Design a protein with these regions (language model features):
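N-terminal helix initiation/capping motif
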Residues: 1-42, 95-106
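Short conserved beta-strand and strand-loop elements enriched in small hydrophobics
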Residues: 25-31, 59-69
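Short beta-strand-centered aromatic/proline hotspots
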Residues: 38-40, 74-78
Length: 106
């Protein structure tokens, strides 16, 4: 029974649509009309990212991610705990944009 549960969990974790890349990109995150909060993107894919933010953000909140050289990008908070959060992009980033950040070392 434990093996079946582990296999099911493994399948669930493998369902991501986009490959995530470890990065370290300084940026900002804003919601509503508040000024941007400084963040560090720690992983990036075309469909979303993981960030270090230092504060709690409510799940399913519409936020705007600002990265160097890009316009603010609309996202939703997928999860938030211990000063970190996962964001899902409303529209995927072009793969060339992701590769640019990865090639630059994040």
């Amino acid at each position: 029974m434990r093996v079946a549960a582990a296999l099911e969990r493994g399948v669930a974790f493998d369902r991501r649509r986009y490959v995530r890349h470890a990065v370290a990109i300084g940026g900002g995150l804003s919601a509503n009309i508040r000024p941007a909060t400084p963040i560090v993107v720690v992983d990036l894919s075309a469909g979303g990212c993981g960030i270090e933010i230092g504060i709690h953000v409510d799940v399913d909140t519409l936020v705007w991610l600002k990265l160097p050289g890009l316009e603010s990008w609309p996202c939703r908070v997928a999860w938030s705990r211990d000063g970190r959060a996962g964001l899902t992009f409303d529209h995927p980033l072009h793969p060339a944009v992701v590769e640019r950040f990865v090639a630059a070392g994040g």
